[in-house]
UniProtKB/Swiss-Prot annotation:
Keywords: Amino-acid biosynthesis, Cytoplasm, Diaminopimelate biosynthesis, Lysine biosynthesis, NAD, NADP, Oxidoreductase
Highest rank taxon of the organism: Bacteria
Organism of provenance: Synechococcus sp. (strain ATCC 27144 / PCC 6301 / SAUG 1402/1) (Anacystis nidulans)
UniProt similarity note: Belongs to the DapB family.
CDD domains per UniProt: DHDPR_N (cd02274)
Protein function: Catalyzes the conversion of 4-hydroxy-tetrahydrodipicolinate (HTPA) to tetrahydrodipicolinate.
GO molecular function, a single term: 4-hydroxy-tetrahydrodipicolinate reductase
Name used for this protein in its record: 4-hydroxy-tetrahydrodipicolinate reductase
Transmembrane segments: none
Active site, per annotation: H162 (proton donor/acceptor), K166 (proton donor)
Listed pathway(s): Amino-acid biosynthesis; L-lysine biosynthesis via DAP pathway; (S)-tetrahydrodipicolinate from L-aspartate: step 4/4
Residues noted as binding (S)-2,3,4,5-tetrahydrodipicolinate in the record, renumbered to the chain: H163, G172, T173
Main subcellular location: cytoplasm
Any one cellular-component term (Gene Ontology): cytosol
Length: 273
């Protein structure tokens, strides 16, 4: 019988981290070996007790390198799932790769230069690394539907809405959506008039191939995206709504199971072979 995949969760006490802990505890083929969080008031506490599962015998620590070192000594190839912050994610991933721990990254905010550097680092180390802007299967299907629709429409804009604790804007998911549309090789939104913003930023950020992205941050939201296509006489709106973070867990577990079989960096759930 195969041994379960050892998993460390970084950002374990955050909203996504807590859901990930629960998903790992419920799965038979993965096992939690580490929980990392920065908050001083949770250090040493059992992460199972914190998330409401009862004892898991995994104490919370803020020592990332120490935990990566311990995980690297496991019998099976270990994985670290990272839901932390844009300010530290680049360094977190480099440290994980250096220890041979396979990163599954749900934290957005990495720029293109950082992604390229991490890709080269992972390739050189022969380590798989997955950077996933959105773990929702439904969101992947929305992106695929947008690609199909974009063949018939020349005008498109993206609206993304998230909770007010999200640090980066626009979201990694919205950027990924725009990038996928841009890969079709067509330029969107040919100008109709000479625009003048009386308030800077009113028309949103201009992404690849002239695709505008608009960001909303409000309490009460979780994660939502609309891809809006326009043509004379009609509007087509594709929308995905996250009602509960549990919808991300099938994608998280898929990434954990797949990353150990890969070499180099892959960006996006849809690109996992």
């Amino acid at each position: 019988m195969a041994h379960p995949i050892p998993v460390v969760v970084n950002g374990a006490t955050g909203k996504m981290g807590r859901e990930t802990i629960k998903a790992i505890a419920a799965a038979d083929d993965v096992t939690l070996v580490g929980a990392i969080a920065r908050s001083a008031d949770v250090q040493g506490q059992d992460i199972g007790e914190i998330v409401g599962l009862g004892p898991l015998e995994v104490p919370v620590t803020n020592d990332l390198e120490g935990m990566l070192c311990l995980a690297s000594q496991e019998r099976e190839v270990p994985v670290v799932v990272d839901f932390t912050h844009p300010d530290c994610i680049y360094d977190n991933v480099r440290k994980a790769i250096a220890y041979g721990v396979r990163p599954v990254v749900g934290t957005t905010g990495l720029n293109n230069e950082q992604l390229q550097e991490l890709a080269e680092f992972a390739e050189k180390a022969s380590v798989g690394c997955l950077v996933i802007p959105n773990f929702s299967i439904g969101m992947v299907l929305l992106m695929q539907a947008a690609i199909q629709a974009s063949r018939f429409y020349d005008h498109v804009e993206i609206l993304e809405l998230h909770h007010d604790q999200k640090a980066d804007a626009p979201s990694g998911t919205a950027i990924k959506t725009a990038q996928m549309l841009a890969e079709l090789g067509k330029t969107f939104n040919p100008p109709k008039v000479t625009e003048k913003e009386t308030m800077p930023g009113a028309r949103g950020a201009v992404g690849p191939e002239n695709i505008r992205i608009h960001s909303v941050r409000l309490p009460g939201l979780i994660a939502h995206e609309e891809v809006i296509f326009g043509a004379p006489g009609e509007i087509l709106t594709l929308r995905h709504d996250t009602m509960d973070r549990s919808c991300y867990m099938p994608g998280v577990l898929l990434a954990v199971r797949k990353v150990r079989q890969l070499t180099g960096l892959i960006y996006g759930l849809d690109r996992i072979p």
